[in-house]
Amino acid sequence: MDLIIKPTEACNFKCTFCSSSKITDVDSTAQLDLFKIFRFLDRYPNTNTIIVNGGDPLMMGPKYYMSLIEFLDKNDYPATVALTTNLWPFMVKPKKWLPVFQNPRVGIATSFQYGGGRLKGDLSEFTEEDFWKCSDAVLKHCGYRPGFIAVIVEENEHTVIKTVELAKKMGVVCKVNYAMASGEQDAPYVKGKRYKHYVDIW
């Protein structure tokens, strides 16, 4: 069994297609209490993976994840921690995150797609060049390139094959997801179109 958590809805990016939902309608700064995770793990000690989504998980700071790792180590629980992050905070300040990223329990994944909808905090586009820099930072400090998720929307549907070719060039796996009607994304990507893309990839 896996546990999927969302510690925060905060994010350093402003992606136009974001389907991340709110933790609460009352407080956008709300954070998931670690003790709730600890109670779950005590009840289900054989949990395989703790999958961390966002917002962006790195908005929590390293201490949050080190406390979780210390709890797992103390109780000899087998769970690994899978972080899916845009990697920008790590690329800017890698030393800050090395204790988390280099921990053997932790695996890193990221996200990227073409089309201009992936925007940094200053609303400038997160480009392929930016993506390579973030991926290179993980390769340099952790010894591997992270796989990534790409989201299909109307604006970038013509770049799906290009995205798969990028993953091949990087030597990683790319998971091509369709946009869902959630969060800032007000309409799902049409089912018939996404199946056509999957056939084209195949």
Q: Language-model features: where?
A:
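Radical SAM/AdoMet-radical enzyme domain recognition
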Residues: 37-51, 61-183
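Catalytic metal- and UDP-sugar-binding loop of GT-A-like glycosyltransferases, i.e.
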Residues: 5, 52-53
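Short acidic/His/Gly/Ser-rich catalytic and metal-binding motifs that mark active-site loops
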Residues: 13-17, 117-119, 184-186
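A C-terminal junction/extension of Radical SAM enzymes
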Residues: 182-202
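Alpha-helix N-cap and loop-to-helix initiation/capping positions
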Residues: 27-32, 60, 122-130, 190-197
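Conserved, mostly hydrophobic/aromatic
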Residues: 11, 15, 52, 83
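Active-site neighborhood of divalent metal-dependent phosphoester/pyrophosphate hydrolases
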Residues: 55-57
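Canonical Radical SAM [4Fe-4S] cluster-binding loop centered on the CxxxCxxC motif
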Residues: 1-34
